[in-house]
């Protein structure tokens, strides 16, 4: 499983797709005059590093890390950034950033109760959760469990077809695969 996750995190078209999702969320928020405070989370630090650097280098928004081993003062500085790059472990611990209203889950996970709860606990802040669904059997099964949780909580689920172009060996033709969707949960939880 860890090898599959590693390869998933290193797949360049997927990483670029995630950056484009972040850009789209920020643009839509600006167009609708919605203030977004975004947390991007993953298990794997390599994808977090990639996303942090891409966001910074493309000047998408202010960005900072929220990962284990950081000093308290550095975590506080990161809390003021528009985009917070964090591990699932840090997002599930004593995280209490009241202004967070957007979550982008970049790696699959079965139990998202605590993570999603961080975003959805404050009513009226236009909460948005983006849950990226990957097509491998194992990851699809994890999605089914997350979807059951979302349905149980009566979150509104909207599907967005991905715009990632993938072919043999990662280049070429477009894949039209039901499993490769982003799910958005809006005003509840957007997948």
For each feature predicted by the language model, list its residue ranges.
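C-terminal helicase lobe
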Residues: 3, 126-185, 189
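Short phosphate-engaging motifs
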Residues: 14, 47, 111-112
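Conserved interdomain hinge at the start of the Helicase C-terminal
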Residues: 1-40, 50
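Conserved helicase motor "Helicase C" RecA-like lobe of SF1/SF2 P-loop NTPases
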Residues: 34-70
């Amino acid at each position: 499983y860890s090898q599959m996750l590693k390869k998933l995190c290193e797949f360049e078209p997927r990483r670029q797709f995630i950056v484009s999702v972040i850009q789209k969320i920020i643009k839509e928020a600006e167009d609708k005059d919605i203030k977004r405070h975004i947390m991007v989370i993953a298990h794997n630090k390599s994808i977090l590093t990639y996303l942090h650097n891409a966001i910074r280098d493309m000047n998408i928004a202010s960005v900072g890390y929220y990962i284990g081993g950081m000093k308290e003062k550095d975590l506080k500085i990161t809390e003021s950034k528009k985009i917070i790059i964090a591990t699932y472990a840090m997002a599930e611990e004593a995280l209490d950033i009241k202004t967070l209203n957007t979550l982008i889950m970049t790696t699959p996970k079965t139990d998202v109760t605590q993570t999603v709860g961080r975003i959805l606990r404050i009513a009226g802040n236009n909460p948005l959760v983006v849950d990226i669904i990957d097509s491998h059997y194992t990851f699809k099964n994890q999605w089914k469990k997350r979807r059951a949780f979302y349905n149980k909580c009566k979150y509104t689920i909207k599907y967005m077809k991905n715009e990632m172009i993938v072919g043999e060996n990662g280049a070429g033709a477009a894949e039209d695969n039901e499993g490769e969707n982003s799910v958005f949960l809006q005003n509840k939880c957007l997948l």
